[in-house]
Amino acid sequence: MTVIKDGWHGDTSKMFLVGKCAPHNQRLVQITQECLYKGIEAVKPGAYLGDIGNAIQKHAEKNYYSVVEDYCGHGIGKIYHEEPQILHYGKPGTGIQLKEGMCFTIEPMINQGTKYCKTLNDGWTVETKDGRNSAQWEHTIAVTKTGSETVSYTHLTLPTMIRV
């Protein structure tokens, strides 16, 4: 979901479990959310983009999942998609160094199987190449003087996982 307020863009997404879900799918959704928060925890002035990606990748792989490399987070502000690209994998201490005032999305896509995806003939729909499930969570993050602020949070944030 995106919001434009006074010319500034925001971007966020959540996963919702609908109906009765297998425990392995519930776990995928939970670990993906944890990957998002691991990435957010790495955000602070002086850190690097690679620190964010590494935190996400380590948590995903520790839980036997893979990180989609074909899609990434992005800078956001007066323009919806802008530089830098925020990879959800990487090596610590690499990439652009974070500075106070930067704003970007972190939106890891985590797969049960391999990291590979394919785009269907409609040019829009994407699925995993191996047919296994994938999950995604996203928040818009601002780098602050002392760390970060998740600007897509509100006091109205919905519970972590809702079963409809």
Where are these regions (language model features)?
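Short, acidic (Asp/Glu-rich) active-site segment that either coordinates a divalent metal cofactor
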Residues: 1-40, 103-127, 135-145
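Histidine-centered active-site/metal-ligand motif
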Residues: 9, 74, 81, 139, ...
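Active-site cores enriched in adjacent His and Asp/Glu residues with nearby glycine-rich loops
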Residues: 43-84, 96-102, 112-117, 145-146
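Short alpha-helix capping/helix-loop boundary micro-motifs
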Residues: 89-93
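Metal-cofactor-dependent catalytic cores
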Residues: 132
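Short, well-ordered strand-loop elements centered on a beta-strand within folded domains, enriched
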Residues: 146-153
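Conserved small/polar residues in nucleotide/adenosyl-binding loops
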Residues: 153-160
